[in-house]
Every structure is written in C-alpha cells, then in structure tokens.
C-alpha cells in the first residue's frame, strides 16, 4: 500500500503549481530539441544537449510530483489536538547542554525549511518528538553528535511559510 504524504493545503498547492508550470514548459523544451536537431551534427550541439537534459529533468520531476500529489494527505493542523507533538505542532525545546531554547514546527517533507523553524515530520528530530509532551526529554543523534532536549512547550500556531 502506498504511504500517504502528509502536508498542509499550502504544501499541496505549491506542488500543484510546480507540476502545472513544468507541464506547460515541457512542449517548449521539446520544440527547442527539434529546432536544435535542425542545426546538424548533434555530437557538438550544445543547445540540443542542454534541451535534452532539461527535458529529462522535467520528466523526472513531473513523475515525482505526480506521485506526491497522488499520495498527498492534506491536513489542517488547526483542527488537530496539540497536547502532544504531532503534525503541525510547534514545539519549544531546550538544548540541555547549551541551555539554548529553539522552536520548530512539524510540517510535510515538501514544506520543510529548517532556517525558518519548519522541519519535516520524517527528520530524525521530528520522529523522536512525535508523541512527546511538555516535560519529556529526548536524546537525538544528529550529524554533530547526540543532543539532549527537554520539551518545554507544545502548541499550535498558524504556520508562516516563506517562499
């Protein structure tokens, strides 16, 4: 059975827009390939090779986006409980060793933007946080080593996505 891909309405619309834009671009790239073929020797035809590469990228990305859209599970996080960490929850953490507070919101993989505090539900940190409550402690293995966190607060706030 296909695994559903949780995302907000924003994430779904973002994927849909990219899908539509690529579907629109594809025939233009096919035309570029045909025009480039008219220039003769394809072995040394940079336009031809660039257009072929672009077409391969578009086709692969269309397949990927089509799969994502088919598996999309659009979730409205404002309608979910946030007494425990879950999809759409904002969680305030304390890095116990550094005594530093950080805040993350759990979102879909296509919506993640760690620089803006949005982490995918399938990252190592998010996977360990899901189901935790205020006061719980976790140890997360990250590339820079193990880090101990305490969950200070779990709540919902409207998600602000940055383009």
UniProtKB/Swiss-Prot annotation:
Residues 12-73 form a coiled coil. Keywords: Coiled coil, DNA-binding, Transcription, Transcription regulation. HAMAP family: GreA_GreB. The keyword DNA-binding applies. It comes from the Bacteria. This is Transcription elongation factor GreA. The gene is greA. Transmembrane segments: none annotated. One of its GO terms (molecular function) is RNA polymerase binding. GO terms for biological process: DNA-templated transcription elongation; regulation of DNA-templated transcription elongation. Pfam families: GreA_GreB, GreA_GreB_N. Belongs to the GreA/GreB family. Necessary for efficient RNA polymerase transcription elongation past template-encoded arresting sites. The arresting sites in DNA have the property of trapping a certain fraction of elongating RNA polymerases that pass through, resulting in locked ternary complexes. Cleavage of the nascent transcript by cleavage factors such as GreA or GreB allows the resumption of elongation from the new 3'terminus. GreA releases sequences of 2 to 3 nucleotides. PANTHER family: TRANSCRIPTION ELONGATION FACTOR GREA. It comes from Nitratiruptor sp. (strain SB155-2). Signal peptide: none annotated.
